[in-house]
UniProtKB/Swiss-Prot annotation:
Source superkingdom: Bacteria
Organism annotation: Shewanella sediminis (strain HAW-EB3)
Official protein name in the record: Elongation factor P
UniProt-listed InterPro entries: Elong-fact-P_C, NA-bd_OB-fold, Rib_uL2_dom2, Transl_elong_fac_P/YeiP, Transl_elong_KOW-like, Transl_elong_P/YeiP_cen, Transl_elongation_fac_P, Translation_prot_SH3-like_sf
Key word Cytoplasm present: yes
Biological role stated in the UniProt entry: Involved in peptide bond synthesis. Stimulates efficient translation and peptide-bond synthesis on native or reconstituted 70S ribosomes in vitro. Probably functions indirectly by altering the affinity of the ribosome for aminoacyl-tRNA, thus increasing their reactivity as acceptors for peptidyl transferase.
GO molecular-function terms, A-Z: translation elongation factor activity
Keywords: Cytoplasm, Elongation factor, Protein biosynthesis
Pfam family, one: Elong-fact-P_C
Amino acid sequence: MKTAHEIRPGNVIMLNGSPWVVQKTETTRSGRNAAIVKMKLKNVLLDSTTETTFKGEDKMEDIILERLDCTYSYFADPMYVFMDAEYNQYDVESGNLGDAAAYITDGMEEICQVTFYEGKAISVELPTTIVREVTYTEPSARGDTSGKVMKPATIAGGATLSVADFIKTGEMIEIDPRTGEFKKRA
């Protein structure tokens, strides 16, 4: 059993007797009240999605499923195709990827973990750090250097995130795809 705080995108939880893939989590903390965790979930069996709110201490059954290390191969609308070390291919529906789809690019070399439920590939977990090229960002503004200055940037794959003010278009950066946060220049 895990608490709602410990659940991450890509985990599969049992809720009301059905397995659900966690696509997105967002934790909100307020001064007096306990933390609240909002989750976007996709039902593995019915292909339906829902957004649910939990208290941070709520216990959930995290289902242990078969996981394989795979690399991204290609996109065949609406399926992303991943390949394991023995050259077996696994199709994952784009709807099962959630926010991770924005970080998947042609030619990516990072090893991903594909999760299976009853023989069907249901989700993909990206590594904790990936390197991507910044395809567009505004030039840095002079004089705005007090504190940690961030600006929006678009990376290869289409995701938009906040990066440090000194990052320029064309540079490679390290990103945590689970949170969408900029880590450092690569």
